[in-house]
UniProtKB/Swiss-Prot annotation:
One of its GO terms (cellular component) is cytosolic large ribosomal subunit. GO terms for biological process: translation. Part of the 50S ribosomal subunit; part of the 5S rRNA/L5/L18/L25 subcomplex. Contacts the 5S rRNA. Binds to the 5S rRNA independently of L5 and L18. It comes from the Bacteria. GO terms for molecular function: 5S rRNA binding; structural constituent of ribosome. Keywords: Ribonucleoprotein, Ribosomal protein, RNA-binding, rRNA-binding. Belongs to the bacterial ribosomal protein bL25 family. NCBIfam families: PRK05943.1 (NF004612). This is one of the proteins that binds to the 5S RNA in the ribosome where it forms part of the central protuberance. Residues 1-20 are annotated as: Disordered. This is Large ribosomal subunit protein bL25.
Amino acid sequence: MFKFNAEVRQSQGKGASRRLRHNGQIPAIVYGGSEAPVSIVLNHDDLNNAQVHDAFYTDVITLVIEGKEVAVKAQAMQRHPFKPKLVHIDFKRV
């Protein structure tokens, strides 16, 4: 089972997302269910190391957002065209 710590993202937009990526973080979003969508930030290295396993795409992932555990599945990932980096990820609540 995969478990990641996430922070709620305060700033939005292209410039803010680029600054996050430059600092080794990935912008992401959690949506679905009865709750409102939440923009979050995750550590790039943690996600990049986990996404090489097939189970990352099929198993339930636990995100700890502000101390609250949220069960999600990876819905969509955007990767850099030629660098081995993730650009953005969408999570859907389970």
